[in-house]
Amino acid sequence: MSTVQVPKLNTKDLLTLEELTKEEIISLIEFAIYLKKNKQEPLLQGKILGLIFDKHSTRTRVSFEAGMVQLGGHGMFLSGKEMQMGRGETVSDTAKVLSQYIDGIMIRTFSHADVEELAKESSIPVINGLTDDHHPCQALADLMTIYEETNTFKGIKLAYVGDGNNVCHSLLLASAKVGMHMTVATPVGYEPNEEIVKKALAIAKETGAEIEVLHDPELAVNEADFIYTDVWMSMGQEGEEEKYSLFQPYQINNELVKHAKQTYRFLHCLPAHREEEVTGKIIDGPQSIVFEQAGNRLHAQKALLVSLFKNVEEPS
């Protein structure tokens, strides 16, 4: 560990990327790149991370469990439905009890307010593994992926096309924080949350970022360095079939990407529905880096875990 220092974060928890400064984000990314090259660093020897899941997961569960093992600790899976919290115990009581047993909590659930309460009532770090409003760990991995490709955020344009969902929200805050240009194109009625857009615009004024929310996908991807999409229907929305016709013009396909830079890279948080939000030719093509992006979830989260756990041990 002589080459890279553990980032000092001015927060106990990570609930949204709004809580981190640009400098903290960059230091986390650089630390994640170090950990990617040095997988077996036992920096969390004997530490236990509780993993609370109310939503199905592949990448989040496996990357957090594998990350804790590689760091010398242990990830403990806790099904939200099987815990007493799922049978009426308050979030506050759950937070206080878990703080007696384990060293940190990662929670993947529906209500962002529940995660905020869990963090407020816990004496240990709480990480938002996804809520209906935010997906900060994904955005951190996305920034890492972009940084590995470009070694900068200055002058980089990220175009997000599709549903203005939790992933979009976290990317807006992330782009604003690091001073990147981000355009969002959604159908009318599916724009990102207005309050989150306002927050991103306010941050952008301080960092020099550009944030645009549009309805024209061609305009959004014009001269883009990175094109990003997500599924049109998030978990719990599967009955909204009428969305398909509205979203069809927002599919990432050969026609749409002609408007981006020739050297563009394609991003997707996965799971993907081929021939819906993206064609197979794009996601499986040479300019797609979605699996490198998925791999970076592991490394970005390891950097975050070490930083948050060390902050508890050595408070500033």
Curated annotation (Swiss-Prot):
Compartments where found: Cytoplasm
Keyword annotations: Amino-acid biosynthesis, Arginine biosynthesis, Cytoplasm, Transferase
Binding site for carbamoyl phosphate: S57, T58, R59, T60, Q84, R108, H135, P136, C137, Q138, C269, L270, R297
Annotated pathway: Amino-acid biosynthesis; L-arginine biosynthesis; L-arginine from L-ornithine and carbamoyl phosphate: step 1/3
Catalytic activity: carbamoyl phosphate + L-ornithine = L-citrulline + phosphate + H(+)
Top-level lineage group: Bacteria
Keyword Cytoplasm assigned: yes
Pfam families registered for this protein in UniProt: OTCace, OTCace_N
Leader sequence residues: none
Binding site for L-ornithine: N166, D230, S234, M235
Enzyme Commission (EC) number: 2.1.3.3
A GO CC annotation given for this chain: cytoplasm
GO BP, one annotated term: L-arginine biosynthetic process
Keyword field contains Cytoplasm: yes
A GO term, aspect molecular function: amino acid binding
PROSITE patterns: CARBAMOYLTRANSFERASE (PS00097)
Family: Belongs to the aspartate/ornithine carbamoyltransferase superfamily. OTCase family.
Described function: Reversibly catalyzes the transfer of the carbamoyl group from carbamoyl phosphate (CP) to the N(epsilon) atom of ornithine (ORN) to produce L-citrulline.
PANTHER family linked to this entry: ORNITHINE CARBAMOYLTRANSFERASE, MITOCHONDRIAL, ORNITHINE TRANSCARBAMYLASE, MITOCHONDRIAL
NCBIfam families, A to Z: orni_carb_tr, PRK00779.1
Name by which UniProt lists this protein: Ornithine carbamoyltransferase
Protein source organism: Bacillus cereus (strain ATCC 14579 / DSM 31 / CCUG 7414 / JCM 2152 / NBRC 15305 / NCIMB 9373 / NCTC 2599 / NRRL B-3711)
